[in-house]
């Protein structure tokens, strides 16, 4: 089924041995539009404020009760690799998460992690290499432009709970007197300018 992703922001995130924090944001691949990670605000029980969990460690969200559950203990979460969520996630950081969470994953996603490597071998990596991972929260407020001009403001994402794919953008279109929400397929996105905060569509909205 399809759900508004923003309904989960601020919702409890529960480990197998108790609540660990709340949903801060989600990280998605800006090429496949698939959610890859959940960013959890863990409050004060860890020295760091946020932890990043692969979706492969999560159950389907409980939309009725607005809760996310992980197949991890709080100790496993606390010992996970430290990722600065205010900066783009590097390939090196994702390899560290893959190495740590891989054996803990409750299911396998074809787009998560790296190809299998023989024991003892390391993945070739350049420290500066950055993945195409973006925060859903950081994109809210971006201008959405069609081929025939300005269309609206990005207000959210609609996700398929089975695939974690962001199939639609929730766009507020029109002026303050006649604004309306329009669902725009992500397959219509031509490009995203992170510097200019613009989502460009290759489609007319007239």
Go through each PLM region and give its residues:
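Peripheral interaction segments used for macromolecular assembly
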Residues: 1-206
